[in-house]
UniProtKB/Swiss-Prot annotation:
EC number(s) stated in the UniProt entry for this protein: 6.2.1.76
Task of the protein: Catalyzes the initial reaction in intramitochondrial fatty acid synthesis, by activating malonate and methylmalonate, but not acetate, into their respective CoA thioester. May have some preference toward very-long-chain substrates.
A Gene Ontology molecular function term of the record: medium-chain fatty acid-CoA ligase activity
Name of the featured protein: Malonate--CoA ligase ACSF3, mitochondrial
Natural source organism: Xenopus laevis (African clawed frog)
Residue span of the annotated presequence: 1-19
A Pfam entry, by short name: AMP-binding
Region Disordered, annotated ranges: 394-413
Length: 578
């Protein structure tokens, strides 16, 4: 079932005729707006409720132009009315309905997200690069009651939704109307809901350890994520961020979209990542200026490659460095480990030391290097305000599992157990941003937490020299070889310093004698050759003997997902099928 709606600046209404939903054009009228401000911002509210504070400011800039906060709010309210017309009133349900949506990287995403929340429903963002089978899985697993899709995606989503009996609301960008022409009069008021514990968003994990799980966050979880980052990274309404990431992960949704919209700042969003366009924004060449940039390490590597190829003259390079230092106040890297050679080269090029931080779908951001002050390469800093972290070792017992705590801290400091300094262990997190549950997976949710309420991240970490270090996923990045524990991420950081290696993934290959052996999968620079013996000789100067790769696999490309992550379990199955 497909129902016409609006995208950008067009609107259609719908009504029931003989059991079918039909599309009817709304007449154009002049219009006055009465936007009532939220009663209080001291309680938990969704980000859309802040829009009236910044009514005429530019909220977003996309390929269609500029969009004010009032523009986004009015368009969202109109779409919300259509969602309510189709679903009844989701806000009246004890368990809100789920609404899955798929939009391009432009203002339509915000309009749809806000509209779902205005309706009292739970937003389930879909990934445009996922194959139909994965999209169908999310629709089915989330038990979505409605699919909202921009018209270019309906050919993919409509057949899937029809198989599952889910109606589809189509967003169309064919018209070019001003918001004042959308409705005769619209009065926007604060929904009378208790937002705090209400479900807000389900984001599906990348599924590197099995089928993706739906991570349900409440409005309080999102509020906590956003306000912590806004305060810690100094967001103001004068900021402007360049957005080039997908919009189905916390990094792209919360850090790069909700944070600027919370404070009245501007989000300049690109349809897709393009190195040339990003450099144009950095240098202010006939494009909107920006002063914040966040990305994954893979993107920084591609920006460096573009720089090396196109900015060859010394005067140009001096200009690039000066422009980046003058125009940009903050550059952040996350979602996967940042290779130190990339950090160092980026610092040489732009004068910026990338701010590394640590987070995941289930917890938002937990650790960050300081906005001001020294940033330790390879480390992820200290807990954000409101977040508690600890590193522990499990002590299995008949009656359950107890933990020995090595280090535990919050934003005010970290306490280290005597005799357990610099000891690695599982990183566990507690705080208001930690998710509510895995959708419809009670046992998985229960197993994800300790008996005293700490979320088990599955990452191995260490507190050392006043900062936290992530050593990798316990399941795939900690290689147990001959009694030693080897961090695959540490080995990767070293190998990326080799002049012939441009990309690398280190895995633990099965070994009858040692349990596991260190295997390096590498992409070499064009025209370069490298043997295992040559790599071993080079590595002896920079790595402990037990960390040196025992196997070298050369590939043309190392597969990564949109967030730059490598599925190492798939690599193990591919190269070691038995």
């Amino acid at each position: 079932m497909r129902v016409g709606a609006f995208l950008g600046r067009s609107l259609f209404s719908c009504s029931h005729v003989r059991g079918a939903l039909v599309r009817r054009r709304t007449p154009q009228h002049s219009c006055s707006f009465h936007i009532s401000k939220p009663r209080s911002l001291s309680h938990v509210v969704p980000v859309f409720s802040r829009a009236p504070l910044f009514s005429e400011r530019t909220a977003m800039v996309d390929q269609h132009g500029k969009h004010t906060y009032k523009d986004l709010y009015i368009r969202s309210q109109a779409l919300s009315k259509m969602i309510i017309q189709l679903l009844g009133n989701p806000s009246h349900n004890n368990t809100p309905e789920r609404v899955s949506f798929l939009c391009p990287n432009n203002s339509s995403y915000v309009v749809c997200q806000w509209a779902v929340w205005m309706s009292g429903a739970i937003a389930v963002p879909l990934c445009k690069s996922h194959p139909p089978s994965e999209l169908k899985y999310v629709l089915q697993d989330s038990q979505s009651a409605l699919v909202v899709a921009e018209e270019s995606y309906t050919n993919v989503l409509s057949p899937l939704a029809e198989q599952l009996g889910i109606p589809v609301l189509t967003m169309s960008g064919s018209q070019n109307l001003h918001p004042s022409e959308l409705l005769q009069e619209i009065k926007i008021s604060q929904l009378d809901l208790d937002w705090k514990d209400r479900g807000a968003m389900i984001i599906y994990t990348s599924g590197t350890t099995g089928r993706p799980k739906g991570v349900l966050s409440t409005h309080y979880n999102l509020y906590s994520m956003v306000t912590a980052l806004v305060n810690e990274w100094g967001w103001t309404k004068e900021d402007s961020i360049l957005h080039v990431l997908p919009l189905h992960h916390v990094h792209g949704v919360v850090n790069k979209l909700m944070c600027p919209l919370w404070v009245g700042a501007t989000c300049v969003i690109l349809p897709e990542f393009c190195p040339k366009t990003v450099w144009q924004h950095f240098l202010g060449r006939d494009v909107p200026s920006i002063n914040i940039f966040m990305a994954v390490p893979t993107i920084y590597s591609k920006l460096i490659a573009y720089y090396e190829q196109h900015f060859t003259h010394s005067n140009v390079r001096e200009f690039v460095r000066a422009a980046c230092q003058e125009r940009i106040r903050l550059m952040v890297s996350g979602s996967s480990a940042l290779p130190v050679p990339v950090l160092e080269r980026w610092q040489e090029i732009t004068g910026h030391t990338l701010l590394e931080r640590y987070g995941m779908t289930e917890i938002g951001m937990a650790l960050t290097n300081p906005l001001h002050g020294p940033r330790v390469p390879g480390a992820v800093g200290a807990p954000l305000p409101g977040v508690e972290v600890r590193t522990v070792t499990q002590n299995p017992r008949k009656e359950g599992t107890s933990y020995t705590t090595h280090a535990q801290g919050d934003s005010t400091g970290t306490m280290v157990s005597v005799g357990l300094e610099n000891r690695e262990g599982e990183l566990q997190v507690r705080g208001p941003a930690v998710f509510k549950e895995y959708w419809n997976k009670r046992l998985d949710t229960q197993e994800a937490f300790t008996s005293d309420g700490w979320f088990k991240t599955g990452d191995t970490a260490m507190y050392k020299d006043g900062t936290y270090w992530i050593l990798g996923r316990t399941s795939v990045d900690i290689i147990k070889s001959g009694g030693y524990k080897v961090s695959a991420l540490e080995v990767e950081r070293h190998l990326l310093g080799h002049p012939s290696i441009t990309d690398v993934a280190v895995i633990g290959a099965p070994d009858v004698t040692w349990g596991q052996r260190v295997a390096a999968i590498v992409k070499l620079r064009d025209g370069h050759a490298l043997s295992l013996q040559e790599l071993k000789e080079w590595a002896r100067a920079v790595m402990a003997p037990y960390c040196i790769p025992a196997e070298l696999i050369r590939v043309e490309e190392i597969p990564r997902n949109q967030m730059g992550k490598i599925n190492k379990k798939q690599l193990l199955v591919h190269f070691y099928p038995q």
